[in-house]
Amino acid sequence: MGKAELLKVPLFRRFFQRMNIPVNRKSNMDSHRAFKRAGNDIDKGISIALFPEGTIHHNAPLMGRFKNGPFRLAIEKQVPIVPITFLNNWLLLPDDFHKRIGHPGIARVIIHDPIPTKGLSEGDIEKLKADVYAAIKKPLRKKFPEYYSKE
C-alpha cells in the first residue's frame, strides 16, 4: 500500500500500478477500501508490505507514531508481521523524492524475525505495535545513537 500521489511520479507509476494498492490518504472511505483489498490479497496468499507510520517521517531516522490499521489487519487475518528496518533510505530518498530522483547509494535493510499474531485479538494491537516498533528501532538506535540519545 502506498499513497496515491505516487501514481503521478513517472518513474514509479508503472511499477506502483502493478505492485501496490494506492491510498488517497485524505479519504477515510478510500483507506477502508485499500485495507479491504489488502485483506483480500492476504486471503489469496499474496504477501503485502505496509509502512505502519503511513508516511515518511520528517525527522528520520527517528520513527513516527505507528497507525493501528496494519496491526488490525494482521490480527484479523492471523498472519505474522515481518518487521523490516530501512537503515538509510532517509539519506537516499529526499522528502520530496516525488519531485526529483533520490541519491545514489546502497539501501541497507534488516529483515527481522516474524512476529506471530495467531491467537491475538484487537485488544492486543498496542502490544503488537510496541513489539514491532522495538524490533525496527533497535538497529536504528545502534546505527544512529546521536538521534536516539535524548529518548
For the regions a language model picked out, list residue spans one by one:
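Catalytic core of membrane glycerolipid acyltransferases/transacylases, capturing the structured
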Residues: M1-N28
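Non-catalytic C-terminal accessory region of glycerolipid acyltransferases
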Residues: R33-E151
